[in-house]
Amino acid sequence: MPEVVRRKLDMLHYADDLKDLCSPPNNRLESLKGGLSGLYSIRINNQWRIVFRWSDAQAHDVRIIDYHRG
């Protein structure tokens, strides 16, 4: 999994636009709701997500969360 995490973080770092994260499709870019409203996520796998805030063409407040534990 470490290689996948590094690759996804690199994609996030080099993205110029939020749309850049739509590919590959297995990123499953999502706009989050509820207590995480205003944040986005991409999937590492079925359990783990990279969650971030997008502004000024950059990802901010990046963190990795266990989706099943919040």
Regions found by a protein language model. Name each.
Residues 6, 16, 27, 59-61, ...:
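Functionally constrained cores in energy, signaling, and assembly domains
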Residues 1-9, 13-25:
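A charge-rich, low-complexity, intrinsically flexible signal that marks solvent-exposed coils, linkers
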Residues 2-4, 11, 31, 55, ...:
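Generic secretory/membrane-interface signal
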Residues 33, 37-70:
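Enriched for short, Lys/Arg-rich terminal
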Residues 16-40:
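A short, surface-exposed loop/turn module that caps and links secondary-structure elements
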